[in-house]
A protein has these predicted regions:
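Extracytoplasmic/periplasmic solute-binding protein
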Residues: 1-31, 36, 66, 75
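Bilobed periplasmic-binding protein-like "clamshell/Venus-flytrap" ligand-binding domains
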Residues: 1-5, 145-156, 244-248
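Glycine-centered hinge/linker elements that transmit conformational signals in sensory
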Residues: 29-59, 104
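Short helix-initiation/N-cap motifs at beta->coil->alpha
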Residues: 56-71
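Short, well-structured alpha-helical segments that form the helix of a local strand-helix-strand
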Residues: 70, 231-243
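Alpha-to-beta junction loops
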Residues: 71-81
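C-terminal lobe and pocket-closing loops
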Residues: 84-95, 108-215
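A structural supersecondary motif
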Residues: 99-109
Length: 248
């Protein structure tokens, strides 16, 4: 089966962005029970009911409880950010040569958004630091320069934010690279397939998002996928609780 999450929102967020949806209205007010959200979550629930998707151990694909399910073949597919590549090399060495990286499915071939960025640990410079300018310069080099981005791929297996690296085949198809050796597809082919269709959810930078994330990953998704609660009912419940929290 394909992995369904209850402690993360990788698949739901992707589907929501593909549909042009969000967790908030344009004015920033809460809208976690909007029609697009209902459609996306219901699609996932229908897939679960059909046996094509189910809750993965630990609630999401990136945890030690889930890794054995890949090795056993119980989990056939998972939608994850590109940094998941490193987990395969660290925890699932027996699957070398058996795992493919592909662009995620879409609702329609002509959809503007094909994928979104997901996860990752943010890096920030403290503005009050006496060396803030120097720190910002160093981080800009680490995050953006060609040289550093090549090593982001070589060492970490992450998709470099400097997309110029994506077309340098001496880097992306280097036969000596551990990630090129592990996967049975060319990893950067998937990135190039979706390069012009990378979207985002604007709510990611909103102050309400931590509470929304907590609500979905502790209650809403479990209510739907573990307890069988009606999708609209679960989302209405989340909307009410969050509105109460923020006084809307």
């Amino acid at each position: 089966f394909a992995a369904c999450e209850t402690t993360a929102q990788w698949t739901l967020n992707l589907m929501l962005a593909q549909k042009g949806g969000d967790y908030l209205n344009d004015d920033g007010s809460l809208a976690v029970n909007n029609d697009t959200m209902v459609e996306c979550l219901q699609t996932m629930k229908d897939m679960q009911d059909a046996g094509a998707m189910d809750v993965i151990a630990g609630g999401q694909p990136d945890n030690e409880e889930a890794y054995p399910l890949y090795n056993s073949g119980d989990v056939a597919a998972a939608i994850m950010p590109f940094w998941q590549t490193s987990r395969y090399l660290s925890y699932m060495t027996d699957l070398s040569g058996k795992v493919a990286i592909a662009a995620p499915p879409v609702f329609g071939d002509n959809d503007a958004v094909k994928t979104i960025g997901g996860g990752g640990t943010g890096t920030a410079v403290v503005a009050s630091s006496p060396n803030a300018d120097l720190a910002a310069e160093v981080f800009a080099y680490i995050k953006l320069s060609d040289t550093a981005n090549v090593e982001v791929w070589n060492v970490l297996g992450f998709d470099p934010v400097n997309t110029a690296v994506w077309t340098d085949k001496s880097v992306t198809e280097n036969p000596d690279n551990q990630y090129v050796q592990y996967f049975n597809t060319k990893p950067f082919d998937a990135l190039l397939d979706v390069q012009d269709g990378i979207g985002l959810l604007t709510c990611y930078t909103d102050e309400k998002m931590p509470s929304i994330n907590n609500m979905f990953c502790t209650e809403t998704l479990n209510n739907v996928f573990e307890s069988g609660m009606d999708v609209k009912e679960a989302l209405d419940e989340a909307q009410s609780a969050l509105q109460n929290e923020f006084g809307e």
